[in-house]
Amino acid sequence: MTGRKECKGLELSTLSKILLLILPLVVAVLALCIGRLGISPAEVIRSIFGKITGNADLESKNELVLWNIRMPRIILAALVGAGLSVSGCTFQSLFSNPLATPDTVGVSSGTCFGAAVAIFFGADFIVTQAVAFLFGIIAVLLTYLAGSGKGKSLNSVVLAGIMIGSLFSALVSFIKSVADVNSVLPVITFWLMGSFAGAGYHSLMLGAPVMLVGMAVLYVIRWRLNILTLPDDEAKATGTDIKALRAVSVICATAITASCVSMCGQVGWVGLLVPHMCRMKFGNNHVSLLPACISMGMTFMIIVDTVARSATAAEIPISVLTAVIGAPFFIILMRKTGGWQL
């Protein structure tokens, strides 16, 4: 396949597939061991098998910590890491822009505004999650109403997304300015910085299906995503319905991002850093790239969350850590590899 740039990168080798499959699982097991209450890897593995076979002692302190606190956090961290990485990769290909992120079309800002409004009016976590997701979708619809139309290019959508994102960010600032400084403002501020502290099985049941369906659809059509990086005339020559492909890609990536942000707040860098890292290692071919983004995104976010909840007495906001870890790592990676181009 040719285009602006050749889609470099062959099919993943069997060894690479095994490593990408095992890596997040190993990191997840280690994350279950780490925390203020230390649990040995052997005990964690025993507990997992006991849960599967129905022989687990669910009343013990270690079991309660494992299954009621750490497990839902790790599941959510893995889903969010994979989801934001896949969304970032999709948007970068869709807009042929290496700086595109899941917030390019304003979805993160809209979701944050929805959460801020819900928290301002005293909604519980589940309602906040639902309202945040709804406003994320509304933000994307506004972006496409403003940026799409006859004779308009994808750059118009990007510019509209920047404007809509700025509008919702300003509205969030307004909500914070009128919120009660003692009870409401700290909750909004901490939520906006990202945290998995509110993870639970009920919230996962609400948000996880959206993420999983979105990622599954993008995974199934991953080979077609290579076509998005071609000029329009070459893309049409392949016989693919480009408008339909773009629509499906945007809908899936938007739904994934809105669901991620609605469950844990705004998490920066993941949707930019992980796709770049995977492109540098595995090339631009989405057949290999998307599975790599899923695995590396899960691994990265589980590690970040483990540090966030274990490094200090007070939990560190996720976005702080992703920036502190991501920015230097990304700079080093760019200097060593020379970057990548679509």
What are the language-model segments listed below?
Residues T2-L342:
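Alpha-helical transmembrane segments in inner-membrane proteins
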